[in-house]
Amino acid sequence: MHGGLTLGKSYEGLEVVEYPYLRVANVQDGHLDLTDVTSLEVPPAVAEGVMLRPGDVLMTEGGDLDKLGRGTVWEGQLAPCLHQNHVFAVRCFPHKLLPHFLAYVTASRYGRDYFEATGKRTTNLAATNATKVGAFYIPLPPLAEQKRLVQYLDTEIGRLKAIQEIIGKQIDTLTAYRKSLIHECVTGQRRISAEDLAGVGARLPEAEACA
């Protein structure tokens, strides 16, 4: 596990280069938000020690308790790119552990129970630390099994997201129709007939119709 860059240090007298770096706000629950990436100037030697590599599993030090410790895999979207010290970068041994498998483990009920139990809670937020992240026990099936599980979860989650998107569009359409219908009725553009009222009554649940 690699710690990140501590902000506010002075590098006076040293040659510096501008690098983008990830903040806690960039690491979301299961994905990265790279719409607003900040940059800063540090010496190349300092940057080398906190530079992200594809396959690093990113975890935030603090946030909502139910999202604490959830891993997001860095795919090299920006190169080079550094990370702040409040963002942990876990680098897996490729012959033992797949990054995406680790990310799914941290998002599982097993992972959630661990980080919720070990997280330090404050009024609105919770926090973990490098020691607790390092102590997280990771089940290690053979790499072939890890790969199979990752492929299965990727497929199923992708399918569920597609269904969710379709339902979301349907809800948007129905919401727009509802607003249009209300507008037409209250402005007199649509006349309500006895048949319309009878149809509404027929669709009401029995308990409501009898109330």
Residue ranges and their predicted role:
Residues V24, V42, C92, I138-L140:
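Hydrophobic residues in beta-strands and at strand termini
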Residues V27-Q28, L65, R112:
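Active-site/binding-pocket entry motifs
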Residues L40-E41, V46-A47, Q77, T123, ...:
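A structural connector/turn signal
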Residues R23-V24, E48-A107, L125-N129:
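A short beta-sheet element
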Residues L7, P80-F88, K120-K147:
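A short glycine-rich beta-alpha junction/loop motif
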Residues D113, P139-A211:
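Amphipathic alpha-helical coiled-coil/heptad-repeat segments
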Residues M1-Y11, P20, A25-V57, R203-E206:
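Sequence-specific dsDNA recognition surfaces
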